[in-house]
Amino acid sequence: MDSNKDHKDIPGNPSTAYSSKFHLNDRSNGKKLQILTESDWDFWVKNGYVIIPQAIPKSYTSRLAKLLWEFEEKDPDDMATWYATASKDMEMVELTNSGMVEIYNHQYLWDIRQYPKVYEAFTDIWGMDKLWVSIDRANLNFPSKPGFGFKGFIHWDYDPETNPQNVQGLVALNDQVDEDVGGFQCIPELYRSYETWKQGQPI
């Protein structure tokens, strides 16, 4: 596997590789699914994403959520602190007010990444046990209000032109029923029509 260093001066989380002999699981190895049900698998193949309920213990999500509030120097019970000017500068200034929290390697994050149910879900998707983990940050979003609109933008967290394919996991730390809150956006059908879709995009 070759390392793509073209991005080395660009901030963010680019893909760690652009070539690989490995591909997503096509079930041809006959290996039994560990976490996904057959219904889950069919949904994954059709939509390009799948939801794993109760993937990690509630205690894991609670302690990480508490850490994020503390790291951002905000109080979950005091809305006045939610919209205060950030005390930390972000290298990618376009991410200001996007909810991204610059925390990557805390043990709480690694406990989630390595939790058996999470790991086994990825082994189902890849069809192999030896996985390479890339890391990303956490996210803490607040309701939009005048003067503090959500400034995130829909994007890929990897270069879709590269091989191998990438699969990203997202863990919701709280149940969210308000459609106006949250940082995740998904277009399920795009992975099936990407090649056609990109032909109609401006260069």
Q: Whereabouts are the PLM-identified features?
A:
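A residue-level signal for beta-strand positions that form part of recognition/binding surfaces
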Residues: 49, 166, 183
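Short hydrophobic-aromatic micro-motifs
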Residues: 51-52, 171
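Short loop/turn segments at secondary-structure transitions that flank enzyme active sites
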Residues: 58, 144-146, 173-175, 190-193
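Double-stranded beta-helix
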Residues: 20, 24, 176-203
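Hydrophobic side chains in beta-strands
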Residues: 140, 171-173, 186
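Short C-terminal domain-edge/linker segments immediately following a structured domain
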Residues: 82-86, 143, 167-169, 199-203
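Short, conserved beta-strand element in jelly-roll/cupin
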Residues: 159-179
